[in-house]
Amino acid sequence: MSLTRCPECRKKISENAENCPNCGFSFKQKDLEMYKQRLEARRLHNEEVNRKSTKLHIIWFCIFAIFIAVTSWMVN
């Protein structure tokens, strides 16, 4: 009897279990497909958030660089 981890709660459970005894996650094929779809949707959402965050960091860096350049030009 080998053990595997529940994808929902990460506890070790039997490979033959139909449901996780800890969180109740179902290992039926239909439920696994739904879980994979939700996981993919979450991954795509996180990817979009990261892309927007990167753009925001670049914009703030440019504003800061312009501010430093203008300030140093005014001092000299």
From Swiss-Prot:
Q: Mainly resides where?
A: membrane
Q: What's the domain of life for this entry?
A: Bacteria
Record key words, sorted: Membrane, Transmembrane, Transmembrane helix
A single cellular component GO annotation: membrane
Subcellular localization:
Membrane
Transmembrane stretches in the record are 53-70
Give yes or no: UniProt keyword Membrane: yes
Q: Does the keyword Membrane apply?
A: yes
Q: How is the protein disposed in the membrane? A: Single-pass membrane protein
Q: What's the protein called, per UniProt? A: Uncharacterized protein HI_1126
Q: Which organism is it from?
A: Haemophilus influenzae (strain ATCC 51907 / DSM 11121 / KW20 / Rd)
